[in-house]
């Protein structure tokens, strides 16, 4: 999954790294335990990896192999893959990146994949064979299906302990709650998924993500009651009604096409992070944003041009889009991190709260900076293209300050 909502992470000082860590948690990044790419990275980081590129079923796989790449298009015999393999990937990987071998496209029978396998990747482009009941072992926690895969799931097809399921771009089948394992926590849908948003029966799901560029235009019918993380389709542009969003939702990301007014009571009190897509341009009326909201971000190329007001005091992180240039007269009292737009050029005297620790001002900002304008606890200050001399004492003593940083290293986000 990729998104223009992702912030940039370029600075390397200790405070900046800590900021990036917090910002990723607040803004867009999928929570670590819901991320489809974090489990295997941890596996590689925390254990000794022995990779093997299996180029023919007649070749013997080393018994020490724990990461196996299937690089052929022939049936896989039963009981051949050793019971030490943890990561099974139907794609050939070399040290310089991924290179495709022959696309595997054969049925997988029970007993083919050993009980040790936890992560299964059909990254090859053509795989589209129906899954066979109980062929994927109960040890499997993560399943990534190829872009061509478009087979409906039947009872027993998916492992009973599956935590994360990611479908490819051509998958467009409804999800039957009776055949989806109760262990499933995270579901990632490809660009082509265009079934009704009727997921209320998937009660174990806590993370639901539509891929960037998704074509799904359908309204929400029901969402999982325990959902905490929701990223809607870029084509979604329907009103959000009261009670539509789950009561435990913490992070909500609207796609690029969403531009509906938000009414009081439509966003659940549990919401901590909200991210708006490209075309969103609606005012924030009083009491619309939940009291305990922690972060607000706008798309990099956001159209948002409304007055930035009625923001809850507990908000700690704000990121504006590239062109936002409305005067800001007040900011939340608990704010720690702010990224003004590249076009912002209004006075900030008396605007920045004492809680602020990280501040980015874009290349259009040319207002005078004087002692006392920045709070004394500021840790990171970036002025991208500031043309004027800065009087002594303006930048707090312990602040990591960069003026006119090099291209690509100018964002605190």
From Swiss-Prot:
InterPro entries from the UniProt entry: FNIP, LRR_dom_sf, STK_FNIP-Repeat
Cleaved signal peptide residues: none
Domain of life the protein comes from: Eukaryota
Pfam family, one: FNIP
Keyword list, A-Z: Calmodulin-binding, Repeat
Segments annotated as FNIP repeats: 104-148, 149-192, 222-257, 258-301, 304-343, 344-386
Molecular function, one GO term: calmodulin binding
Oligomeric form and interacting partners: Interacts with calmodulin in the presence of Ca(2+).
PANTHER family given in the database record: FNIP REPEAT-CONTAINING PROTEIN, FNIP REPEAT-CONTAINING PROTEIN-RELATED
Protein name from the UniProt record: Calmodulin-binding protein CmbB
Organism listed in the record: Dictyostelium discoideum
Gene transcribed to yield this protein: cmbB
């Amino acid at each position: 999954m990729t998104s223009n909502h992702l912030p940039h992470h370029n600075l390397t000082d200790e405070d900046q790294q800590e900021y990036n860590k917090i910002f990723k948690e607040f803004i867009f990044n999928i929570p670590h335990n819901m991320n489809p790419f974090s489990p295997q990275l941890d596996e590689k980081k925390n254990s000794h990896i022995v990779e093997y590129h299996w180029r023919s079923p007649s070749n013997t796989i080393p018994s020490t192999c724990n990461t196996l790449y299937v690089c052929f298009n022939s049936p896989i015999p039963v009981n051949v893959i050793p019971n030490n393999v943890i990561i099974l990937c139907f794609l050939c990987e070399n040290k310089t990146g991924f290179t495709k071998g022959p696309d595997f496209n054969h049925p997988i029978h029970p007993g083919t994949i050993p009980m040790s396998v936890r992560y299964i990747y059909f990254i090859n482009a053509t795989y589209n064979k129906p899954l066979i009941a109980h062929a994927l072992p109960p040890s499997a926690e993560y399943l990534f299906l190829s872009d061509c895969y478009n087979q409906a799931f039947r009872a027993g097809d998916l492992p009973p302990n599956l935590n994360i399921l990611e479908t490819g771009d051509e998958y467009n089948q409804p999800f039957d709650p009776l055949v989806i394992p109760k262990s499933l926590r995270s579901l990632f849908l490809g660009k082509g998924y265009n079934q009704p948003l009727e997921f209320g029966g998937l009660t174990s799901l806590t993370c639901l993500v539509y891929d960037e560029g998704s074509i799904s235009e359908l309204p929400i019918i029901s969402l999982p009651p325990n959902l905490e993380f929701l990223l809607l389709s870029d084509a979604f542009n329907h009103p959000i009604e009261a009670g539509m969003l789950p009561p435990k939702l913490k992070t909500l990301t609207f796609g690029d096409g969403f531009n509906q007014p938000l009414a009081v009571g439509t966003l659940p009190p549990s919401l901590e992070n909200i991210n708006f897509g490209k075309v969103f341009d609606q005012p924030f009326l009083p009491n619309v944003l939940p009291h305990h909201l922690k972060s607000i971000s706008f798309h990099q190329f956001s159209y948002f041009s409304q007055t930035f007001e009625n923001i809850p005091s507990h908000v700690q992180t704000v990121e504006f889009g590239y062109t936002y240039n409305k005067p800001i007269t007040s900011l939340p009292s608990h704010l720690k991190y702010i990224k003004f737009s590249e076009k912002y050029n209004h006075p900030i005297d008396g605007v920045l709260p004492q809680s602020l620790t990280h501040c980015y001002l874009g290349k259009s900002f040319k207002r005078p900076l004087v002692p006392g304008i920045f709070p004394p606890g500021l840790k990171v200050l970036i002025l991208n293209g500031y043309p004027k001399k800065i009087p002594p004492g303006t930048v707090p003593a312990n602040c990591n300050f960069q003026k006119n940083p090099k291209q690509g290293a100018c964002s605190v986000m």
